[in-house]
Curated annotation (Swiss-Prot):
One of its GO terms (biological process) is tetrahydrofolate interconversion. Gene3D superfamilies: Domain 2, N(10)-formyltetrahydrofolate synthetase, Formyltetrahydrofolate synthetase, domain 3, P-loop containing nucleotide triphosphate hydrolases. This is Formate--tetrahydrofolate ligase. PROSITE patterns: FTHFS_1, FTHFS_2. Coiled coil: none annotated. The gene is fhs. It comes from Rhizobium rhizogenes (strain K84 / ATCC BAA-868). It comes from the Bacteria. Pathway: One-carbon metabolism; tetrahydrofolate interconversion.
Length: 559
């Protein structure tokens, strides 16, 4: 029996083209690329600006059912579909997010696709890449430093230290930093106050980077960040502290999309990386818009299940950027459907058609939800070797009864050859003219009503609960002119409910709103539900324990 190669072994054996050649495939002159080595480059701002009058290609969203902790291969399917479209003669670009060090060293061990459907250089993308996350972290913490410095030197803006909302950021899972006391150690260190850290991918600066249309818009949004409140309860903005210019300088290069390639030497833009459970979960607007000008088809993903990533892609990213998707793909795996049907993790490798059919209710809910946005949809069954024919047919039959099609995809094992059928179906849907995209709710509804619409229509909740402080805060923001903003729900990715242990398609559950945060620069209100954390912790046996350099100096353990 042949040994199955690991993702990193496959990536390392790939025959990469020089990044200048990948750019040439898209018509990008060498002088408009800023190479980082030979296999990655940033696309110049002037080249991007010159594309504005070109027609747009078709936009395809890849989303998924509620995942198992290991993920269901959404990025793998996104990359595979991009390769598949190129294989059948279409000019396609993949747009995905950059990987965070937190989950890389925590649970996932990497996030650049898998098997024979990866973006490369895999090690670089998963680690420091082109430094974008470091730039975001630096800009975020520069603002934090300027806040405490302003207070130290007299507090001219009369900031109420009890009402500072801006926390610090770090691209790592570190529960010890969730709540801290800063400025201890005496007068020379400033005024002690409570604070904390969020993971960089939950930072408003990351969201701003991913939603800004250009450098001018970036600086304006950075200035709009509310860092806290004065004693008279009026908001203090980043521009009040003269932070916006310096923050924009730190982010100047990070704003430019990163060009890399797939294993099959097709172009991919990897840019931005907000989480979908605690942020809006989509790659950058500037990368997506650039790709739409350069290709006939753009395949992008939104994080976690369609209840989180897809809803935010539609209601936040598309609304803000004026994008209209032409088709959607929902990735499902037999193992995740069985888990949603009540099968324990250790038993997922055994055939269980009965549990699978029960778990298909989760897939059916996601299918119905995507259709609510007016986007035609197809299901991709991401094949695992443990899947049986009976299980695969059960999924296909279930989806057919809902008036859609489920297509078995073997891109992980076979690359683009294993996903041709899905590629043809996506072209058919995208060219059909069926797409009549519309967000779930209009801008002019009250914020609480927007929360209730997402909870009832997407999660099928029976009730939204929020205490008086939360309701008063939402009304206060409406009075300040922020009522038109969309809501960004922070919720567990493992369930439609706020309880990660409730699988399937629960009905009538309660969504408890614990906290709300105004991201005035990004342009949305974050709604924190259940026990979700904006600074994750590491698991008992983190992936970091299995990552090392071998005797040849190569990285092992990324997967």
């Amino acid at each position: 029996m042949a040994t199955v190669k690991s993702d990193i072994e496959i990536a390392r054996a790939a025959k990469k083209l020089p990044i200048i050649e990948i750019g040439a495939k898209l018509g990008i002159p060498a002088e408009d690329l800023a190479p980082y080595g030979h296999d990655k480059a940033k696309i110049g701002a002037q080249f991007i600006a010159a594309l504005k009058d070109k027609p747009d290609g078709k936009l395809i969203l890849v989303t998924a059912i509620n995942p198992t902790p290991a993920g269901e291969g959404k990025t793998t399917t996104t990359v595979g579909l991009g390769d598949g479209l190129n294989r059948i003669g279409k000019k396609a670009i993949v747009c995905v997010r950059e990987a965070s060090l937190g989950p890389c060293f925590g649970v996932k061990g990497g996030a650049a696709g898998g098997g024979y459907a990866q973006v490369i250089p895999m090690e670089d993308i998963n680690l420091h890449f082109t430094g974008d996350f470091h730039a975001v972290t630096s800009a975020h913490n520069l603002l934090a430093a300027l806040i405490d410095n302003h207070i130290y030197w007299g507090n001219e803006e009369n900031i109420d230290v009890r009402r500072i909302t801006w926390r610090r950021a770090m691209d790592m899972n570190d529960r010890a930093l969730r709540d801290i006391v800063a400025s201890l150690g005496g007068v020379a260190n400033g005024y002690p106050r409570e604070g904390g850290f969020d993971i960089t991918v939950a930072s408003e600066v990351m969201a701003i980077l991913c939603l800004a249309s250009d450098l001018k818009d970036l600086e304006k949004r950075l200035g709009d960040i509310i860092i806290g409140y004065r004693r008279d309860r009026t908001p203090v903005y980043a521009r009040d502290l003269k932070a916006d210019g310096a923050m924009a300088v730190l982010l100047k290069d990070a704003m430019q999309p990163n060009l890399v390639q797939t294993l099959e030497n097709n172009p991919a833009l990897v840019h931005g990386g907000p989480f979908a459970n605690i942020a809006h979960g989509c790659n950058s607007v500037i990368a997506t818009r650039t790709a739409l000008k350069l290709a006939d088809y753009v395949v992008t993903e939104a994080g976690f299940g369609a209840d989180l990533g897809a809803e935010k892609f539609f209601d936040i990213k598309c609304r803000k950027a004026g994008l209209a998707p032409d088709a959607a793909v929902i990735v499902a795996t037999v193992r995740a459907l069985k888990m949603n049907g009540g099968v324990k993790k250790d038993d997922l490798g055994q055939e269980n058609v009965e549990a699978l059919v029960k778990g298909c209710a989760n897939l059916g809910r996601h299918l119905a939800n995507v259709r609510k946005f007016g986007v035609p949809v197809v299901v991709a069954i991401n094949h695992f070797v443990s899947d049986t024919n009976a299980e695969i047919e059960a999924v296909k039959n279930y989806v057919a009864r809902l008036g859609a099609e489920a297509i078995l995809c073997r891109h992980w094992a076979e690359g683009s050859a294993g996903i041709e059928e899905l590629a043809y179906k996506v072209v058919e849907l995208a060219e059909s003219g069926q797409a009549k995209f519309q967000p779930l709710y209009p801008d002019n509804l009250p914020l609480l009503e927007k929360i209730e619409i997402v909870a009832s229509k997407i999660y099928h909740a029976g009730e939204v609960t929020a205490d008086k402080a939360v309701r008063d805060q939402l009304r206060s923001w409406e009075d300040q002119g922020y009522g038109y903003l969309p809501v960004c729900m922070a919720k567990t990715q493992y369930s439609f409910s706020t309880d990660p242990n409730v699988r399937g398609a629960p009905e009538g559950h309660i969504v408890q709103v614990r906290e709300v945060r105004l991201s005035a620069g990004a342009g949305f209100v974050v709604v924190i539900t259940g026990e979700i954390m904006t600074m994750p912790g590491l698991p008992k046996a983190p992936a970091a324990e299995r990552i090392f350099l071998n005797d040849q100096g190569y990285i092992e353990g990324l997967f």
